[in-house]
Amino acid sequence: MALPDIQAKTRFMVEFPINASPKILFPYLATASGLSQWFCDDVRYVEGQRLNFIWDQENHYAEISGQRLNRAVRFVFLDDHRQTVADANFLEFTLDSSQVTDEVYLRVVDYSSAHDADEQQEMWEGLVAKLREQVGG
């Protein structure tokens, strides 16, 4: 009996300082219109808390599994049949503020099939640079 193809997953985490308030940043992290400006080719609401992230004309469905206004959002990716799966890939954006310096930090947690850490770092640096252009920070 053949075992299912199980891919190793990694939890990649990185933080970036951003010169914008959480109130300005959050819609870019948690809404289809905001995400489509910097994160992927397009994002569309499908139903309720489900979204379709489109990269290179390929659909990737996800569900908002948690959200705290102006603070954090988590997207859990669904299978090809738009169903939840155990050990699903997820993406989490969290905004933190330093009480001492008054700086705002974007923490990204990308849990997905194993990738080269340097490649992921470079990818997220490019994406966050696009986000900074959008918010002026």
Predicted regions and their residues:
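Hydrophobic ligand-binding cavity/cleft-lining segments
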Residues: M1-R44
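Charge-dense, helix-prone N-terminal extensions
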Residues: D5, K9, A20, R50-L51, ...
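Short, surface-exposed coil-to-beta transition loops
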Residues: M13, E58-A62, V85-E92
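A short, structured loop/turn motif at beta-sheet edges
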Residues: P22-K23, S65-R71, L95-Y105
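A structural signal for the main folded, soluble domain(s) of proteins
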Residues: L25, T31, E47, I64-G66, ...
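Hydrophobic pocket/interface hotspot
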Residues: L25-F26, L35, I64, F75, ...
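Glycine-rich portal/gate segments that line the openings of hydrophobic small-molecule binding cavities
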Residues: S36-H81
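Beta-strand/loop substructures that line and gate deep hydrophobic ligand-binding cavities in soluble
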Residues: D80-E133, G137
